[in-house]
Amino acid sequence: MIGNDIVDLALAKKESNWKRNRFLDKIFTTKEQVLIVDAENPEIMVWNLWSRKEASYKIYNRETGIRGYFPLQLECSSENTTFGTVTIKDKIFFTQSRIENGCIYTIAVIEKENFKKIVRIDPAVEIFKKNGIPFIIDFDSNMEKPVSISHHGRFWEGVTLRD
């Protein structure tokens, strides 16, 4: 399983005032808020953690069928600005984020080894949905292949896992 998320930092800055009263309390656990306050660039940390939660939520939703808005149930632990984990209930997701070209891009997987199997999807590839969950058709096997799609502002990314 794979999930991804992308944040256009310019758009996030324009549309979301993360410093407003109680914003952090509604989205981030106490532990995550400490990471934000202690960060060299708190704004980048806000969107880095948000991106990790969103990418992990996509896997959680696909695995459990549970949809909803519960960011406080997804808790990030950060090894560094690139690698970390997100935990929800008894599930752990591994995340890898990169910050470049005005965006934060995160991929989440259920096994660390899956980072080696990531394949980017060409935006021209036809993407289908079943119950709101995206997939592509693998033309070699004619089988459905799960994908994760994310877009925000100027950015779009799609990924799947190589067999």
Protein language model annotation of sequence segments:
Residues 1-163:
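Core catalytic alpha/beta fold that binds nucleotide/phospho-ligands
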